[in-house]
């Protein structure tokens, strides 16, 4: 194997060409620093996972919120964040707590203007994700905060990629695609470079799984290294090894992947071997509403349904999930409720009226109207009668969908695709009829219907997100639809511990000279800025905030 060597021709080496790496590089280029960006994938994958995202951004007290009559504040947002995070580890959460306060402050002040100055815009309706549903000081967003990027994930990538590519044209940035880092070089207690393998060239499209055939080696040196390599979302072995069984229940036997194959988590162990501290390994953020992509891009490609609150949710035994396990309310509590049955899937039961207004699909490619910034298509697909085209395509082609005119036919279809027990028609009918009877009055005792009524008091939900309450068994609202929901892997909430400048911390609590980390590999900041739970719209923001911190710190410190 040929080995290419390099003297420190760049100020900084960035490992990972995803969003966090691009943001850090952008900040360094603004300061006139030279950067060498390495990634094991090809140039087509510039932007990493962020490209595939819906582009949700967590803003606090934004103009969009105020126009919709939403009263938000730093204090309320921090209350929600800390109530969701539930930081309880003095050592592992030491920096995470500080990152949480700093990030919420960023979201309430600079974040929107920082992105707007780069050309990013958001849609006017603000979404209400992770609504919580328990107590004011517990998990969840008290108010809508999910701002959707006009252009979705590709636009978030674009606003940072364009200035970085301009830096490449100016000679400040070099890319080393198909360069897989296998080792951090440590000399005299400081990180001074990286070693790794050059992988064979490929022209595969973005997101496709690529080969790991080695054709050479490399060694590169710089004044500092930023690790921005992402999490473990497609590495099911690592997920199983770190799964929090005591907290969430048994690890699912069947998991489908919400991120591409290159999201392998390799750099976590490599950085730990070099001397960096990993904290909060057992904290993850996977989704309970995963469906198999009928038109996959990567292996085991999963899409998440981002649901409105009206679908009835049943476990694998056909028992309706209790409060607050309603669609879009409390991801980890619902995960625990599902897994305690001993099965790793659940069911939505809904109507055509609900799917038309309440089903959104995660992913830029599943929202071509917003991704393409096509206002006419957006109005047609979101306002016109019928579900958006991609949702209808899943209803017709998805292996997890059952459509029927009667409940008996629906249950028969559900039982054909069940991976566990056969559902009892009479019991399912009893539960649905009981719920439907509660609609006879404008008030009642069904917690989910109360939550729906609360949601529809918010204009954004009533106008575009929450269906008018109706009986599930009303033929006029049909046909009936059932969706088998799988566990979808996604985010690593723990990771490399970092201080507020994104410098990696060693196990003894001291800063690691020459080593920084940003994005998911650092738990989106500090080794776990979200604690145990996320409020959504915070993952892209965590990459941006931690990447910005790393870039700005090194721009100031390097001479």
List the predicted regions and their residue ranges.
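An anion/pyrophosphate-binding glycine-rich loop and adjacent beta-alpha core
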Residues: 268-270, 274-416, 420-423
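Glycine-rich FAD pyrophosphate-binding loop
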Residues: 30-51
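A glycine-rich dinucleotide-binding beta-alpha-beta segment and adjacent secondary-structure elements
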Residues: 420-525, 529
């Amino acid at each position: 194997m040929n080995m290419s060597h390099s003297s420190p021709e760049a100020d900084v080496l960035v490992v990972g060409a995803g969003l966090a790496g691009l943001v850090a590089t952008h900040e360094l280029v603004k300061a006139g620093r030279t950067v060498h960006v390495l990634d094991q994938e090809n140039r087509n994958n510039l932007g990493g996972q962020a490209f595939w995202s819906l582009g949700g951004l967590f803003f606090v007290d934004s103009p969009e919120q105020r126009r919709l009559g939403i009263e938000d504040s730093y204090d309320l947002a921090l209350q929600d964040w800390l109530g969701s995070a539930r930081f309880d580890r003095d050592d592992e959460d030491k920096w995470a707590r500080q990152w949480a306060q700093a990030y919420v402050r960023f979201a309430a002040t600079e974040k929107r203007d920082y992105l707007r100055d780069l050309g990013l815009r958001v849609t006017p309706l603000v979404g209400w994700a992770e609504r919580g549903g328990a107590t004011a000081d517990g998990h969840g967003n008290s108010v809508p905060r999910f701002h959707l990027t006009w252009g979705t994930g590709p636009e978030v990538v674009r606003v940072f990629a364009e200035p970085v590519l301009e830096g490449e044209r100016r000679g400040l940035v070099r890319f080393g695609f198909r360069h897989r880092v296998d080792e951090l070089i440590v000399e005299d207690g400081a990180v001074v470079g990286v070693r790794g393998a050059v992988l064979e060239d490929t022209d595969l499209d973005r997101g496709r799984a690529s080969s790991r055939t080695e054709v050479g080696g490399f060694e590169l040196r710089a004044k500092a290294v930023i690790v921005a390599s992402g999490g473990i979302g497609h590495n099911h072995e690592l997920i199983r090894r770190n799964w929090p069984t005591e907290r969430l229940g048994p690890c699912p036997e069947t998991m489908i992947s919400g991120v591409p194959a290159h999201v392998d988590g390799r750099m976590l162990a490599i950085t730990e071997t070099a001397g960096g501290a990993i904290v909060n390994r057992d904290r993850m953020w996977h989704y309970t509403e995963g469906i198999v992509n009928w038109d996959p891009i990567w292996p085991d490609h999963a899409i998440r349904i981002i649901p409105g609150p009206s679908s009835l949710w049943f476990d694998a035994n056909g028992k309706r999930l209790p409060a607050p396990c309603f669609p879009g309310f409390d991801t980890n509590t619902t995960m625990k409720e599902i897994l305690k049955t001993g099965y790793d899937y659940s069911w939505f039961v809904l109507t055509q009226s609900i799917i038309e207004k309440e089903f959104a699909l995660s992913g830029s490619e599943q929202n071509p109207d917003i991704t393409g910034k096509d206002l006419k298509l957006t109005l047609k697909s979101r306002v016109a009668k019928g579900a958006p085209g991609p949702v209808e395509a899943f209803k017709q082609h998805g292996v997890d969908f059952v459509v029927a005119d009667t409940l008996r036919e629906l249950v028969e279809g559900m039982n054909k695709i069940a991976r566990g027990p056969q559902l009892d028609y009479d019991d399912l009918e009893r539960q649905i009829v009981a719920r439907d009877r509660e609609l006879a009055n404008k008030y009642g005792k069904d917690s989910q219907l109360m939550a729906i009524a609360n949601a529809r008091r918010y204009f954004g939900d009533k106008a575009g997100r929450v269906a008018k309450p109706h009986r599930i068994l009303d033929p006029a609202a049909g046909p009936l639809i059932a969706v088998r929901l799988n566990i979808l892997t996604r985010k690593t909430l723990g990771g490399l511990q970092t201080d507020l400048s994104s410098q990696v911390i060693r196990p003894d609590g001291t800063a690691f000279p020459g080593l920084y980390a940003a994005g998911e590999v650092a738990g989106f900041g500090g080794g776990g800025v979200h604690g145990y739970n996320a409020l959504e719209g915070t993952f892209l923001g965590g990459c941006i905030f931690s990447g910005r911190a790393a870039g700005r710190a090194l721009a100031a410190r390097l001479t």
